[in-house]
A protein has these predicted regions:
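Histidine-acidic metal/acid-base catalytic patches
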Residues: 1-105
Protein backbone atom coordinates (compact mmCIF):
# COMPACT_ATOMS: atom_id res chain seq x y z
CA UNK A 1 0.00 0.00 0.00
CA UNK A 2 1.60 3.33 -0.99
CA UNK A 3 -0.09 5.09 1.94
CA UNK A 4 1.51 2.92 4.62
CA UNK A 5 4.98 4.08 5.65
CA UNK A 6 7.41 3.49 8.49
CA UNK A 7 8.37 5.74 11.36
CA UNK A 8 11.00 5.27 14.06
CA UNK A 9 11.31 6.86 17.48
CA UNK A 10 14.99 6.17 18.13
CA UNK A 11 14.72 5.52 21.88
CA UNK A 12 12.81 2.17 21.82
CA UNK A 13 15.31 0.39 19.53
CA UNK A 14 18.15 1.80 21.65
CA UNK A 15 16.53 0.50 24.86
CA UNK A 16 15.94 -2.91 23.26
CA UNK A 17 19.55 -3.05 21.96
CA UNK A 18 18.31 -3.06 18.36
CA UNK A 19 19.97 -1.38 15.41
CA UNK A 20 18.26 1.88 14.49
CA UNK A 21 19.66 1.58 10.96
CA UNK A 22 18.04 -1.87 10.62
CA UNK A 23 14.72 -0.02 10.28
CA UNK A 24 16.09 1.63 7.14
CA UNK A 25 17.41 -1.70 5.88
CA UNK A 26 14.04 -3.41 6.35
CA UNK A 27 11.76 -0.59 5.19
CA UNK A 28 13.91 0.93 2.45
CA UNK A 29 12.16 3.90 0.84
CA UNK A 30 9.10 3.26 3.04
CA UNK A 31 11.04 4.63 6.04
CA UNK A 32 9.38 8.03 6.07
CA UNK A 33 9.79 9.71 9.44
CA UNK A 34 12.07 9.83 12.49
CA UNK A 35 11.53 11.08 16.03
CA UNK A 36 14.96 12.25 17.11
CA UNK A 37 15.49 12.32 20.84
CA UNK A 38 18.23 11.10 23.13
CA UNK A 39 18.29 8.53 25.91
CA UNK A 40 20.65 7.22 28.53
CA UNK A 41 21.80 3.91 29.96
CA UNK A 42 19.08 1.79 28.40
CA UNK A 43 16.28 3.85 29.97
CA UNK A 44 13.24 4.93 27.96
CA UNK A 45 13.50 8.40 29.46
CA UNK A 46 13.64 10.88 26.59
CA UNK A 47 16.38 13.50 26.74
CA UNK A 48 17.28 16.44 24.54
CA UNK A 49 19.42 15.33 21.58
CA UNK A 50 23.10 15.38 22.48
CA UNK A 51 22.46 15.04 26.22
CA UNK A 52 22.31 11.26 26.45
CA UNK A 53 24.36 8.44 25.00
CA UNK A 54 22.48 7.43 21.85
CA UNK A 55 24.99 7.80 18.97
CA UNK A 56 22.92 10.47 17.19
CA UNK A 57 25.82 12.01 15.27
CA UNK A 58 26.75 8.61 13.84
CA UNK A 59 23.10 7.89 13.03
CA UNK A 60 22.81 11.22 11.19
CA UNK A 61 25.98 10.42 9.25
CA UNK A 62 24.54 7.04 8.21
CA UNK A 63 21.21 8.64 7.27
CA UNK A 64 23.12 11.06 5.04
CA UNK A 65 25.23 8.23 3.58
CA UNK A 66 22.17 6.20 2.55
CA UNK A 67 20.45 9.28 1.12
CA UNK A 68 17.61 9.65 3.63
CA UNK A 69 15.75 12.79 2.56
CA UNK A 70 12.43 12.43 4.34
CA UNK A 71 11.17 13.99 7.57
CA UNK A 72 12.37 14.05 11.16
CA UNK A 73 11.15 15.85 14.25
CA UNK A 74 12.63 16.66 17.61
CA UNK A 75 10.54 15.21 20.39
CA UNK A 76 10.14 17.14 23.63
CA UNK A 77 8.34 15.29 26.38
CA UNK A 78 6.97 15.97 29.84
CA UNK A 79 10.38 16.52 31.44
CA UNK A 80 10.47 19.76 29.47
CA UNK A 81 6.81 20.80 29.51
CA UNK A 82 7.15 23.69 31.98
CA UNK A 83 9.51 25.72 29.80
CA UNK A 84 9.19 24.37 26.25
CA UNK A 85 10.78 27.44 24.64
CA UNK A 86 14.01 27.02 26.60
CA UNK A 87 14.24 23.31 25.93
CA UNK A 88 13.21 23.60 22.28
CA UNK A 89 15.97 26.15 21.69
CA UNK A 90 18.51 23.91 23.41
CA UNK A 91 17.32 20.90 21.39
CA UNK A 92 17.56 22.84 18.11
CA UNK A 93 21.01 24.20 18.98
CA UNK A 94 22.24 20.71 19.90
CA UNK A 95 20.81 19.22 16.69
CA UNK A 96 22.44 21.89 14.55
CA UNK A 97 25.78 21.05 16.15
CA UNK A 98 25.26 17.28 15.71
CA UNK A 99 24.22 17.78 12.08
CA UNK A 100 27.29 19.92 11.40
CA UNK A 101 29.53 17.27 12.99
CA UNK A 102 27.86 14.63 10.79
CA UNK A 103 28.50 16.77 7.69
CA UNK A 104 24.84 17.49 6.99
CA UNK A 105 24.94 21.29 7.15
Amino acid sequence: NPYVVGMCDIVPPFVQHESIMAYFDKLGNKMDHMHIIDGENGSDTHLIPGEGNIPIKEMLYEMKRIGYDKTATLELVTNYINEPRFYAKRAIDNMRELMAEAGIV
